Amino acid sequence: MTDMPPWEPPFNGDEAAALFGALDRQRTTVRWKCADLDTAGLSATTGRSRLTLGGLLKHLAVQEDYCFQVKILGVPMPAPWDLTVWETEGDDWEFDSAAADAPDELYSLWDSAVARSRAAVAEITERGGLSSAAAISLPDGSPVNVRRMVMDLVEEYGRHTGHADILREAVDGRVGEDPPWPVSD
């Protein structure tokens, strides 16, 4: 099956390939749902919700860095994130502040965060893979493994991929689970 889309998780891969493949599939779908939009498209809401595609991009960029950099690798949040902003601006800062960001800035924030996360996968693999301890621990000091942290991020994407489906359809009618893929007959 060489004609599979590049975002399709492997059908016969090991646990790490399946888990990171599932994460990449969610990433690809969210990025496609948010692609090629101007400020109005990224700022559009539906119903009574304040949620926007731009807000989702920024939120997921934060989540990528917080998961891989802080929770797993134990390094500080990279630029441009400043964790004190949530203390002063509230828990929804990334969602609300996205309205002031240009589309190229939002796409760049997300793309850069995903690139950092993908680079972190090599370090994770080198230090023991999914079963290795993440940098964070439970309040009682018990270790948390990398597997759980990555599963949490897959869950976060799953939740917001559904939101992105609804928001994008409201913007311009784009529907579908996966980006178009050229398949040769």
Task: Report each predicted region and the residues it spans.
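Short, contiguous alpha-helical
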Residues: 2-9, 16, 20-91, 133-185
